Amino acid sequence: MAKITFIGAGSTVFAKNLLGDILSFPDLANSEIALFDIDAERLRTSEVVANRVAEALDAHPTITATTDRRQALEGADYSICMIQVAGYKPGTVVDFEIPKKYGLRQTIADTLGIGGIMRGLRTIPV
């Protein structure tokens, strides 16, 4: 059984979608899923959502949630880094507001356009 660790699991929507994709593969449906985030409240929400996704897919993963990064990564076969450097505010807001100020349209996609470049410059060093 594979252990898959989500780093930055407090991003509930992204975690939900990614977990749904992972658990849809029979070989991964019984994986150990370790959710990690520094924000305990958001992490708890993601844990509840993860359990609902597993139930909806009739998958039976072992889901754990922790604010201890080392614990989450211990024994992991795969780790998925989903952190957002600077968070929603100011990070994402600035990624949209600066292009808007100069008449440029920033799409929702995280890695496209001027906002995507700014996000990349914040995230790549991490």
Q: Which residues make up each language-model segment?
A:
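Residues at the starts of beta-strands that form the adenosine-phosphate
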Residues: 3, 32, 62
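N-terminal Rossmann-like dinucleotide-binding module
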Residues: 2-29
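Short, solvent-exposed loop/turn and secondary-structure capping segments
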Residues: 16-17, 46, 90-93
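Rossmann-fold NAD(P)-binding glycine/threonine-rich loop
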Residues: 85-126
